[in-house]
Amino acid sequence: MFCVIYRSAKRDQTYLYVEKRDDFSRVPEELMKGFGTPQLAMLLPLDGRKQLVNADLEKVKTALKDQGYYLQLPPPPENLLKQHLEGEGKN
């Protein structure tokens, strides 16, 4: 199984995985509007892989089969102040 990964033109660190290059037919129109013009990031073989860097491999495969796409959102921002205070035992 291969997938094609596109970077969002509107949202930093947001990626859209689809099964075929330039085929967004199964991606909801509202999602595409919010995503912006997709920018090709890479073609990626999924078979034989044990993991992906920022996404759960099984969730990606399941989403591609069931809905035709997978949307990878950026990780939540770090709250450095909270981490610092917790490190000092303060809340």
Swiss-Prot record:
A Pfam family found in this protein is YcgL
Q: Where is the YcgL domain?
A: 1-85
Q: Which InterPro entries match?
A: YcgL-like_sf, YcgL_dom
Which protein are we looking at? YcgL domain-containing protein Ent638_2370
* Gene3D superfamilies, sorted: YcgL domain (3.10.510.20)
Q: Which domain of life is it from?
A: Bacteria
